Amino acid sequence: MTKRRVVVGMSGGVDSSVTAWLLKEQGYDVIGLFMKNWEDDDDGEYCSTRQDWIDVVSVADLIGIDVEAVNFAAEYKDRVFAEFLREYSAGRTPNPDVLCNAEIKFKAFLDHAMSLGAETIATGHYARVRERDGRFELLKAFDHTKDQSYFLHRLNQAQLSKTMFPLGEIPKTKVREIAAQIGLPNAKKKDSTGICFIGERPFRDFLNRYLPTQPGPMKTPDGKTVGEHIGLAFYTFGQRKGIGLGGSKDGSGEPWFVAAKDIASNTLYVVQGHDHPWLRSRELVAGNVSWVAGEPPSDGARCGAKTRYRQADAPCAFSSAAPGEAAGGERFSLVFDEPQWAVTPGQSAVLYDGDVCLGGGIIEAAATGRPDAAPASCESALAEAR
């Protein structure tokens, strides 16, 4: 009987290596595919592509599978990195890993795998796929501490129908145990924590290679200038480290946080105290929407939402009829039961019904506890969405 062929995305890490081994043990015809998605010739200090490829080959030899490398650097720069820079230039904070999954790992990679005769693909992500009544659902991993469905919420029915996540039902600690037991050469390799395919280099230095510094005033909510920023693109909502302000600037002793950006005046607004009302939001509007099932929840539906990775699901009410829809495509709004901290434009708002990931969108704006005297641009995005 002909074995089902599965192409496994192998990064050189423990998770994808164990994924390949598990599928081989289950009787699949496994091919490993290593993706090079960044031209790192000038970045040897931070990119680990060469060592990662060596690890992939070593693992493939050990478990007895064929492996090949494919270069998606052009696709990555066109579909992911260009958008990444556009968002930062506009003062937002994008999540390139979300777009990388949708456009590279589960599009360019999937297409290439099909050309190799694969019936399905597999990756080392911690998530699950379930077929129910002819539809495919994306579910959280059993190990919620490692769940990665947040990064996968833009996958559609066609992509999920050809995807397996073998680690979705296995705790991370067990994956490490398996790697050690079968003697994987990378069993003790650290997990990657850098931006998708760009590595773990100092982020501000990296961004400065592509975006110019544009210094401007750093002000408090009452308009007092307390410092100078190097460029709005280099700061994100809720940021504490790297602002360059000491807690004693006005005598309160509390730490400073980035609270707003006024693009028109190139002003960065900062506040003191983690619980400052400018850092709390009860409502958000999101666009660039994607639904796993191809359709949104019903208006008024109760769901849980994450506005950042590893955040607990926050209870909220959903509405798909966000005013301003005609001007900018499909949008939705969420009203939370409790104020959420540092809801950041550019990040993803991902919706859940229990363990089922429904999909989500890119946060355009959030209504905070800012008073009426707040800078106009702080509310303009939300007003426009309305």
UniProtKB/Swiss-Prot annotation:
One of its GO terms (cellular component) is cytoplasm. Keywords: ATP-binding, Cytoplasm, Disulfide bond, Nucleotide-binding, RNA-binding, Transferase, tRNA processing, tRNA-binding. Its EC number is 2.8.1.13. Signal peptide: none annotated. Residues 146-148, 308-309 are annotated as: Interaction with tRNA. Residues 95-97 are annotated as: Interaction with target base in tRNA. It catalyses: S-sulfanyl-L-cysteinyl-[protein] + uridine(34) in tRNA + AH2 + ATP = 2-thiouridine(34) in tRNA + L-cysteinyl-[protein] + A + AMP + diphosphate + H(+). One of its GO terms (biological process) is tRNA wobble position uridine thiolation. The active site is at residues 100, 196. It is an enzyme of class 2 (transferase). The keyword Transferase applies. ATP binds at residues 9-16, 35, 124. It comes from the Bacteria. It holds the Pfam family tRNA_Me_trans_C. It is found in: Cytoplasm. Disulfide bonds join 100-196. GO terms for molecular function: ATP binding; tRNA binding; tRNA-uridine 2-sulfurtransferase activity. The record marks 125, 347 as: Interaction with tRNA. InterPro entries: MnmA-like, MnmA-like_C, MnmA-like_central, MnmA-like_central_sf, Rossmann-like_a/b/a_fold. Catalyzes the 2-thiolation of uridine at the wobble position (U34) of tRNA, leading to the formation of s(2)U34. Belongs to the MnmA/TRMU family. PANTHER family: MITOCHONDRIAL TRNA-SPECIFIC 2-THIOURIDYLASE 1, TRNA 5-METHYLAMINOMETHYL-2-THIOURIDYLATE -METHYLTRANSFERASE. This is tRNA-specific 2-thiouridylase MnmA. The lineage of its organism: Bacteria, Pseudomonadati, Pseudomonadota, Betaproteobacteria, Burkholderiales.
